[in-house]
């Protein structure tokens, strides 16, 4: 019998990165730009050297675990029944919600979406999913990764999750510095009333 939460998260992660690919194609078709597939910044190009194999592993590991993988790649026996299994089911459902929420963010960004920090002028989006969180796409990516690690609690998957969360923080900080330099006071005001990955409970003073 197949492990349902594992299958669900494998499909969800694959659809997530298929959506990223679709956004790249969309921006390229509309603007004749590469949407940041090859970053402009040297710093981000260095990050890509880690991120590309990380993403490939994120996609592959759940599928490998569904196909009678080696024990160190498979769902541990303790996670297949009872409360751990119920937690894994819940994580798989949250993962689906992350995918749907990310799709809403993609729709709102439209042709302003990019994978990298770009010299191309883009709008500062502060409404919709971005009204209370500066990086909702990154936040949902982090949560989806955590859900994947909960569904597949193996050493390789957990290590990839820790690395991904770390890179998301580095990427967000780099992007914020760029946006502050481009949008100035407008971005400073936006940052003061929003959180990076979760809504801010209080607004920072000037």
Task: For every predicted segment, state its role.
Residues 1-126, 144-206:
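Membrane-anchoring alpha-helices and their flanking helix-loop junctions
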Residues 131-139:
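Histidine-centered phosphotransfer motif of kinases
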